[in-house]
């Protein structure tokens, strides 16, 4: 159990300190796409929520 906890701590520590990866700047040629790139990580969550809505709608039939 302590090994799993230490592994989680190491992963969180590395994820928090590599924030330069998450906030990298796009090259000037692609600066127009900044708003789209900011929203892109949220798109899979919409599909995840859609699955629950679909199941709820199907169960009410």
From Swiss-Prot:
Which ranges of the sequence are coiled-coil? none
Cell compartments where the protein resides: Plastid, Chloroplast thylakoid membrane
One GO biological process from the UniProt record? photosynthesis
Q: How does it sit in the membrane?
A: Single-pass membrane protein
| Alphabetical keyword list | Chloroplast, Membrane, Photosynthesis, Photosystem II, Plastid, Reaction center, Thylakoid, Transmembrane, Transmembrane helix
Q: Which GO terms describe its cellular component?
A: chloroplast thylakoid membrane; photosystem II reaction center
- Where does the signal sequence lie? none
> Per the similarity annotation, which family is this?
Belongs to the PsbK family.
Q: How does it assemble?
A: PSII is composed of 1 copy each of membrane proteins PsbA, PsbB, PsbC, PsbD, PsbE, PsbF, PsbH, PsbI, PsbJ, PsbK, PsbL, PsbM, PsbT, PsbX, PsbY, PsbZ, Psb30/Ycf12, at least 3 peripheral proteins of the oxygen-evolving complex and a large number of cofactors. It forms dimeric complexes.
What is the recorded name of this protein? Photosystem II reaction center protein K
